[in-house]
Amino acid sequence: MVQLDSKLDEATTAFYEGRSGNIPLAWTITFVILAGMFLVFFLYHRFILPRPASDNATVHAEGENLFSEFFATFKSFFTKENIGPALAFLLLFRLGESQIVKLASPFMLDAREVGGLGLTTGDVGLIYGTIGILALTLGGILGGLVASKHGLKFWLWPMAFAMNLPNLVFVYLSYTTPQSMWLISASVAVEQFGYGFGFTAYMLYMIYFAAGNHKTAHYAICTGLMALGMMIPGMISGWIQEIVGYENFFIWVVICTIPGFIVLKFLKIDPTFGIKKSPLNPPKGE
């Protein structure tokens, strides 16, 4: 059975490729390997991660006290100083990226006649699953290294630009629809590297804002808000794309990065936060 794309409004062509092999077995082997890798990672972190003396439970509650402590933890989070700018940052900093991440793969898989790049699932797997992951990891490592030298506040704006400006590569890809795998892969690598570098600022700010009493619970709340900031815009991204098309959608995504820049002006961050402490190079103010 062949199903045509409802978005096609002119004649098109299609190519079919027959493949043999046990596809269910291939998927099974893939997930068994992944499960084994996660087990290795678990064992590594179980025995390698440090256990500082300060890492102890600070609250011991049972029964009714447990519920009162639960709500007290939320209350203490939402009454923190500068909670307004912090919430805005957590929800808006990735407003553009939260929409791109939902539509990047459909954009690459959709036919060229409907504005996509017409790639195969194998192509997309290579671009995002290999090249993109490597670029993302390298960007994150570099972000951590530079933040340890000058601190979060120093790198906040550069990291914001690094996360958001590379979204322009999707505007370019949607307007030119190149066929070169090298060009598409390089574009995705740039975008993912910038995202990894910029996301360092997001993670560091969550750690910074969660500091104090109930810091573990407060960090968990921050991660929940992080997920909310990705989920809600992502829910409507497909609807927006169907209305305006890929070209205008990616322009819209770039516009959506503006609120994330605006909120940076209202964040209050200790200039020494994030700087790696060393007897030879102590943070400023110590």
What are these regions (language model features)?
Residues 1-9, 109, 146-147, 238-245:
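Interfacial helix-cap and linker-helix signal at transmembrane-aqueous boundaries
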Residues 1-99, 148, 262-286:
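Intracellular loop-helix junctions on the cytosolic face of multi-pass helical membrane proteins
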Residues 92, 179-201:
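Hydrophobic core of transmembrane alpha-helices in multi-pass small-molecule transporters
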Residues 93, 102-124:
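Short amphipathic helix-loop junctions that connect adjacent transmembrane helices
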Residues 104, 197-211:
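Intracellular juxtamembrane helix-capping segments at the cytosolic ends
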Residues 121-122, 212-222:
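Loop-to-transmembrane helix entry/capping segments in MFS-fold secondary transporters
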Residues 138-155, 241-242:
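Helix-to-loop junctions at the C-terminal end of transmembrane segments
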Residues 161-179:
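C-terminal ends and interior cores of transmembrane alpha-helices
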